[in-house]
């Protein structure tokens, strides 16, 4: 099971590398949809089957509508693929090599995978009484996000802030 989740994680990142290398909207939308499906599979394999199903239905359902409209509006006679342009292909390969380097560096044994060590789930007991404790995975995941994962929330907030300016710059009229 661990290998399946690892392969899904690698394909998840490869899909986003494929999207960020700026191919045609047809292939960019396809890579985002595949990455979204793989992300839902990762959530389901981690024990959040209901959350994975809801995200799959809502997120990918909305994405199908948006990308269908985008593809209809931006049809090209000769769509740009990842191998049709040297710049696009090199951006894809550089991103892929960076991911491979990061995986080798993280699994070399010298570094911890997340940057800190979890002693166990005894600190994350949500429902407990006396010596008996019951750990819910989804509640402890939310608690970990706000306690141990504060850097992730700060980075996600910063990325949303920067994406506002990127969207403004892309849609700004040039006279």
UniProtKB/Swiss-Prot annotation:
Source species taxonomy: Eukaryota, Metazoa, Chordata, Craniata, Vertebrata
The reaction(s) this protein catalyses: a ubiquinone + NADH + 5 H(+)(in) = a ubiquinol + NAD(+) + 4 H(+)(out)
Residues annotated as transmembrane: 1-21, 24-44, 51-71, 87-107, 113-133, 148-168
Pfam families named among the record's database cross-references: Oxidored_q3 (PF00499)
Membrane-topology annotation of the record: Multi-pass membrane protein
Descriptive protein name: NADH-ubiquinone oxidoreductase chain 6
Any single biological process term in GO: mitochondrial respiratory chain complex I assembly
The UniProt record lists the keyword Oxidoreductase: no
């Amino acid at each position: 099971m661990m290998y399946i989740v690892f392969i899904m994680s690698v394909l998840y990142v490869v899909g986003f590398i494929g999207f960020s290398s700026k191919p045609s909207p047809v292939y960019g939308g396809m890579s985002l949809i595949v990455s979204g499906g793989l992300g839902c599979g990762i959530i389901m394999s981690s024990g959040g089957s209901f959350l994975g199903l809801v995200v799959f239905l809502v997120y990918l359902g909305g994405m199908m509508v948006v990308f269908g409209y985008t593809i209809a509006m931006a049809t090209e006679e000769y769509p740009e693929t990842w191998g049709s342009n040297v710049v696009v292909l090199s951006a894809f390969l550089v991103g892929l090599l960076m991911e491979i380097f990061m995986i080798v560096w993280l699994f070399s044994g010298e570094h911890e995978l997340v940057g800190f060590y979890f002693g166990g789930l005894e600190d994350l007991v949500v429902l407990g009484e006396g010596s008996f404790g019951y750990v819910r995975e989804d509640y402890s995941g939310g608690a970990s996000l706000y306690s141990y994962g504060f850097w992730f929330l700060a980075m996600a907030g910063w990325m949303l802030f920067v994406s506002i300016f990127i969207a403004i710059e892309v849609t700004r009229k040039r006279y």
